[in-house]
Structures are given as structure tokens and as C-alpha cells.
Amino acid sequence: MGAAAVRWHLCVLLALGTRGRLAGGSGLPGSVDVDECSEGTDDCHIDAICQNTPKSYKCLCKPGYKGEGKQCEDIDECENDYYNGGCVHECINIPGNYRCTCFDGFMLAHDGHNCLDVDECQDNNGGCQQICVNAMGSYECQCHSGFFLSDNQHTCIHRSNEGMNCMNKDHGCAHICRETPKGGVACDCRPGFDLAQNQKDCTLTCNYGNGGCQHSCEDTDTGPTCGCHQKYALHSDGRTCIETCAVNNGGCDRTCKDTATGVRCSCPVGFTLQPDGKTCKDINECLVNNGGCDHFCRNTVGSFECGCRKGYKLLTDERTCQDIDECSFERTCDHICINSPGSFQCLCHRGYILYGTTHCGDVDECSMSNGSCDQGCVNTKGSYECVCPPGRRLHWNGKDCVETGKCLSRAKTSPRAQLSCSKAGGVESCFLSCPAHTLFVPDSENSYVLSCGVPGPQGKALQKRNGTSSGLGPSCSDAPTTPIKQKARFKIRDAKCHLRPHSQARAKETARQPLLDHCHVTFVTLKCDSSKKRRRGRKSPSKEVSHITAEFEIETKMEEASDTCEADCLRKRAEQSLQAAIKTLRKSIGRQQFYVQVSGTEYEVAQRPAKALEGQGACGAGQVLQDSKCVACGPGTHFGGELGQCVSCMPGTYQDMEGQLSCTPCPSSDGLGLPGARNVSECGGQCSPGFFSADGFKPCQACPVGTYQPEPGRTGCFPCGGGLLTKHEGTTSFQDCEAKVHCSPGHHYNTTTHRCIRCPVGTYQPEFGQNHCITCPGNTSTDFDGSTNVTHCKNQHCGGELGDYTGYIESPNYPGDYPANAECVWHIAPPPKRRILIVVPEIFLPIEDECGDVLVMRKSASPTSITTYETCQTYERPIAFTSRSRKLWIQFKSNEGNSGKGFQVPYVTYDEDYQQLIEDIVRDGRLYASENHQEILKDKKLIKALFDVLAHPQNYFKYTAQESKEMFPRSFIKLLRSKVSRFLRPYK
């Protein structure tokens, strides 16, 4: 790779970091090392240290000695007269070391090198009778007026005014006065002083108190001249040596500046200088207005750091906390995600139940008292259906079985769908009229399914309404004939599958003519799919193409039977009529002149792509515009196409689904019920729980003693079983049955043995006194029997997505607790010339298990292969590291002990040319010194962006400079910038 290419790639590089338990290297297997040092077989010098090595040993001279280890000699630190071992007075060499001493009148400073003046006057006034005056390196005694100092230089003698002897106050000697034989006086000086030419004054020399110099002294004609040791400066007094910033930073904690009077200390932002003028004390910014932090303020040395409560993240201003919208992440919830301040909640679609915190599994309703079915129960995805044995068919309530030939007098005759056509201006338009039982299911923006009517009794299962039957049963007018079925596929060019109200005014139409004269249309399904198809020619734009798949079910009109045309004849005639109708429909659909009429509104099945619609027109069928969003009409309402708004269901109808175009007639024909009924139980007139009747409607009678019924509108009651009775009639639950023992949660009552039985593995029971256990949702199971809650149900599947550039591994049932005795193995094999970077945002493995649950990453399955990472503990701080091998074999195992949340570990593969840079970043402790940096490795959006750029550096240009600043803290960007700049330096 050329220098320019490397620079270009690295200038756009963003990277991550590491902390954690990483495996170290190991020696060669099979070799036994001999420790010569401990056995004393080495030949190191007595002043050397023996250090064992894998194959031999080596000798190192001790500190203070020089040589190659087998011969060592003392280093004379004092031999350099200029530096003098750093001693300002005298340097004394000792074997392997040295020490500093000071002249009389001085003492050694704490640094062991400098010499400070001793104030002798502090100790018994220096022995002076009257006045003691301290001086650098010495002191002198003085007397009060009228006295003079005696020869011992400590006591004072009263002066006389007579004569010229030494007792006279005017004898003129500076130090010592001696009387001469002739009666005169002679002056003398104390040791270390020379008598001046006037024979009275005394001149100081370097021999007394080091000449008054703190460090070095040199005698000159004018007296001692002072000097200072290296790195010290002479004070303006000409005697004292002051520290400079070159010596121990001038004694300053932080910043040192040399001045004429000595060093001046200062402190950086976040510290304040203490009264000693040298020490810096940290300022606790959190004491004032919480440091400006929204949530938490944590004081640090010289600064502070803001933190946020769980569920919030710190913005790049490093003060403000913002709620984390977990619902914006991929794979947060299986079905529905609802964000809330600091948290989120996962919900499941109807017929599913939540497990493992975020996952949705199908509820096996049949495991709960047989789904309340009278006979058989068949579980389906998101629902279930009751089935009946031969000779019986399902009641309108979808639970009870009634005789096939038995009519329900209160049930309405199923309204018929109708296919018809009309002409306007020579153009033929066709219509599908759905008077009732319309189901609209939008699969996607450009796909939907519309069904109209009710399948025949011998056809496939009843029309499903979000997993439940339509609630219709046989009526006295329903024909038991086998329906005629036909499937056709139509193609519409330049059209999209948008089911929208048809508002365009059409010319006056001729009367609509039915397409099927000799039959009844009982059920029609229309499935519309749109896709783009590229035209011939590279520059030709792609065109929208829609396909409509129609399935028809028709029944013959038995009332038209005659001697000349019996049942077979009528059926053949109906089939011919259906074929002709399909031909007519094909022409109509091809011209985009096909409409569906529901609840008085005509809808275009597919239309030409138009300009972007605004307002209500931008929403699909079954949706209305609220707060600039398209929202589906809720249960209890239907979409009124002409009004463009949601309309409540009329009394006598109900709607238990969202986004529908009509309401379903109630099974009762009395028109009772609530307006806006959300399910069939709100239709009115049904028997209440604990009661039943032949058709499920009033008048009703109470369930006899020994039976119960928990649901409304039923035709019978369930027996308690095992000869158990109830205290009274009209009971609604098995809990009303007088069982001989009261079972606790995790158990069910066996009516044969009259004992409580623990729920088997794979089931649970959260309530008291039940006669069944609930099967775990989906493909989950429990770790043990007797489970009391759905949270004990765990998915056994090992999660993850392994890609060449990015991917992740996930413990089973994450983020719920993983199951017992789980074993997962993943293999990461990156493309050539790429290396692996792994981030563990957090990992939860119970340490109480004595490492029974382990995650290990190695080169291969062999226990002796190179290990990159291994842990059996919980770490809530992020961990990141590069793989020690090009490929990774990863294993997770759990035992039967405690369980934990587990882990979700993302990884990225990067160009091996960046290996040095990545290693430099991930091994820098500053990456983890800040909680803000740690949160980056936990933020799924930021990790995704970082991995995107690491895997594909050119993708950096997707993120603007402003976006990068808004995504990452300044300190993080600064850290990366310095690393990248240093790495690029050789290429400049």
C-alpha cells in the first residue's frame, strides 16, 4: 500500500479500546528450565544480581556499580568536581552509593543534596550572654550599649570611660582587644577572619561560616565571593542560593517559573495554589451547582465528570443527559418497542407472550384448559383454533361444536359478495362488492391482502381475524354444497398496490351487470404485490409492475335446479360462468378499471404512481393522519373512506382488528350491543360466564353444580372432573371446584389421583388452584420442573450473526438469563489480510458458580491453542481487545448452577495495515479513565458507526464532521487524533 493510500485510510479511521483479562503467552511445552541463580551455580560478581532466563541466566551489576555482571566496580559519583554528585558542599563516595554532607553551620536538606543554614540562635540563644545574631553558616554574639564582647566572644563586659586599655569603650578593635606591654592596645580577629590594614577591623574569609555563602565560597581581595551549585541561582543578597525550576521543579506541585527572587509556582485549571506557595489543591467543582451536570457529578483530580442515570446518555457538551431511545436500535424487541424516559418496554402481538425481556413467543393456548375448546384444539402461530369431529361443525363462538345439520336460528344469513361490471364512455369497469366480513391486511407499503366473505364449510379453515375465527357459524340458509374454487393472477403495468378511496368523478354509468349469474360468490381473496422492473436499455428507468392474485370460492344456486339441469349441470354452468368472469376481470384490471366497494366506499385496487401525496392522501387504507403520522384505525372502528376518518362500529357489529375497512356483523340478529364494539363479546345478548344456552344467547341457565364456564356466549359448561363438585351453580373457574388439596403455583391438580403434580420441564403455572400447566412460548423451555413464571422459560438457541466484516455473538435467551447446561460454539474467520477487534460492552456471569459458566476465545478448539480471552465473571465496565490469532474459536458453557444475563459481543475485522495503530489505542489506559469513554463502548449506535468505519474506511465520508462532534466527546476525538497523527508521522 502506498504512503498516500495509507494516509487517506488512516485519516478517516475511528477506533476503540481495551480493558479486561487478556490471556498472556506461554513457554515452549516440554522444556524444563534449570534455575542456576537459586542453585548457586552462576558465576556472577558479588556485587551483581543473577537473573534466571528460560534457557540460561544473566548477570546484572547492582545499582551504583558498573560492569558486564561478571565483573563489577563501584561508580564514584563524587569524581565529577563540577557536579559533585549533586552535593552542594561535600560528596562522600561509599560502595555502591554516595552521600552528601554539609560544612559546620549548615544542615542537609530533605532532598539529601542541598545545604541549609542552621539558626544557632534558636538553641539557647547560641550561648550568647546578651544578643545572638544569626548569619549564613554562622552566628555572632553582640552586647547591649555600654558593654563589649569578651575574648570568649559570648559574654559581655561593662565598658569604662577611662584610659586607653581594652576596658575602655573606645579601644576601636572590631573583634579582640589585647593590652600591650607599653600600656597600649592591639587588635586581633576571631578564627576565620583576617585583620584589616587599619589594624582594627576584621575581614571575613571563606574559613568562617563558609564566608557567609550558602553553597560555594571564594576569597578575593574584597572579601568572599559566593557561588551556587549547578541548577541553583544566586539570590540578589549575593549569599543565598535559590532553587530554580531545574531542581525538583522548584518544589512546585505543577507549573514552575524562574524569577529574580526565586521560583514562582502556579496551578492549572481545576486547582488552587495553597498558602505555602508550592502545593496545588484540587477544586471540587461538584460543590457548586452540581458542576452544571444534569444528573451526577463526580469530582476528579483537576477536573470533574458528569454522569447519567441508567437509560440516559451524556451528550457531547458533557453536561446534558438525554434519554436513550432503545427502540431505535436494531433487535431491541421482537415485536413492539415502547420507549420511555430512562427505559423501554417490549410488547408482543396478540397471541404471543414476552420472555427473556425482549423476545416474543407464540402462546400455546391449547395447553391452557384445551384453549376452552369443546373438542379438539390446534395451536397456530399467534393463535389457535378449535376443531370438531366429523359430523359436527364449529359454533359462531369458535369454541363449541354443534351438529352439522343443526341450524342456529339467531345466526344471520351470510351476506354475499358480488362481482359486477358497467360501461361508461365505452370503458368497462368492474367492481367487487363486499357487504360484510372484509379483512384488510397491509403486508408492507406496496403489498396487501384483501379478503371478502366467508369460506365454504368444506373449504379451508374459516377466515382468520388476526389469528381468530370470524365468528360465523352455519345458518339455516347456508348451503352445504362443496364450493367451486378458482385462482387467477393478473398483471398491471405502471401501477402500485395502493388501496385508496376512488375520488375521481366518472361519466354516467350504465347499470351494473353481475358477472356470475348462476352462482353465489361466498369468498374472494385479493393479494396485490408491487415491484420495479427495469426496461430494456441501460438508461431506461425502472417501471412499477403490480400483480394481483385472486382466489374465488363460489357456490351453485340450488334453487335453479330442474329436471333438465340438476346439481352437476349447475356446477358446470357455474364453472363456465366463473371462467368468463375472470376473462372480463383481466381486461378491466389491465386498464386499471377494477374497484372494491366496502361499506359504501369504492377503493382503487392499484393505481399509477403519482407525485408524493400530502395530508390524509399520504396514508393508506385503514389509516388516518394524526400529528403528521399515519395511524391505523383501532379496534371498535373502521375506516370511513368517504369521510377519510375512523368511524365507530354500529350497534350489532364489532371490529377486533386495527386498520379495517368495515365492521363484522354480530352473530345475534337482534341489533343489540354497544356502539364501537371491540370484540364479539360486546355484541350483547350473550350468556355471561357461568351460564350457557343452546345457541349461546339469552335466555341462559346457570352451569350445574360440578361444572364451570369462564367465557361468555357458550353452549355448555366444563365438568370439574374426578367427581369434584362446586359449592353452587353458575361458577366460572376450576378454582371454584372443591378440590381435595389446594395446589400452589408451579403445580397443577390431577383430577384422577387428586394430588398436586409439579409442572413438568417446559411448562409453568403462576396461579393457585389450577388444573393445568402452561406450555412455554415458542421454542423455549425451563431449566427445572415446578416453574411458576414465564420468565423461567428460556430460549436454548445460541444467538449471533457472523459476517466477514462485522457481526456479533450472543448468549442464549439474551438479554434474559441464559439456560442451564448450555453450550455454544462460534467460528470467526475473517477474509485474508484482516484482523479481528472484539468489544465486550458488559458481561454477566455469576462468580458464585466457581467458574461453572465460562466464555473462552481461542485460536482453535484445542485447549493448548493461543488464548485471546477467557472469563467466568461479571464485568459491567467495557472490555475491548484485538485477537491474538487470525481466526477465533469461541465457546460458551454453563452448568446447572446460577444463571445470568450473559452477553452480546460485537466484533469487526479491519485491515491488518492498521494493526499497530489499533493496538496503540486499545492499550491506552486513558481510553477507560473516563466514564464517558466507557459509555461509547456500550452505545450500540456509536459502536455500529465505529465498526462501519473500521471495516470500510471509505464509509467515514457518510459521517460529516459535525455528526462526529455530536456523536463523540471531545476528549475521545482528541485521544484518537493524537494516535492517528503519531502513526502517520513516518508517511509525511
UniProtKB/Swiss-Prot annotation:
Q: Spell out the Pfam families in the cross-references.
A: cEGF, CUB, EGF_3, EGF_CA, Ephrin_rec_like, FXa_inhibition
**All residue ranges annotated as the CUB domain in the record:** 798-910
> Could you cite one Gene Ontology molecular function of this protein?
identical protein binding
Q: Do you know what upregulates this one? A: Down-regulated by inflammatory cytokines.
- Report where it is expressed, by tissue: Detected in endothelial cells. Highly expressed in platelets. Stored in platelet alpha granules, and transferred to the cell surface upon activation and aggregation. A smaller form, probably produced by limited proteolysis, after being released from the storage granules, is associated with thrombus and localized with the subendothelial matrices in atherosclerotic plaques.
Q: Which domain of life is it from?
A: Eukaryota
UniProt domain EGF-like: residue ranges: 33-73, 74-116, 117-153, 166-202, 206-241, 245-280, 282-322, 323-361, 362-402
| InterPro entries cross-referenced by the UniProt entry | cEGF, CUB_dom, EGF-like_Ca-bd_dom, EGF-like_dom, EGF-type_Asp/Asn_hydroxyl_site, EGF_Ca-bd_CS, EGF_dom, Growth_fac_rcpt_cys_sf
Question: Which Gene Ontology BP terms does the record give?
Answer: adult heart development; blood coagulation; endothelial cell differentiation; inflammatory response; positive regulation of smoothened signaling pathway; post-embryonic development; signal transduction
Report how it sits in the membrane. Peripheral membrane protein
Q: Which UniProt keywords apply?
A: Calcium, Cell membrane, Disulfide bond, EGF-like domain, Glycoprotein, Membrane, Repeat, Secreted, Signal
User: Can you say what this protein is called?
Assistant: Signal peptide, CUB and EGF-like domain-containing protein 1
Q: Which organism is it from?
A: Homo sapiens (Human)
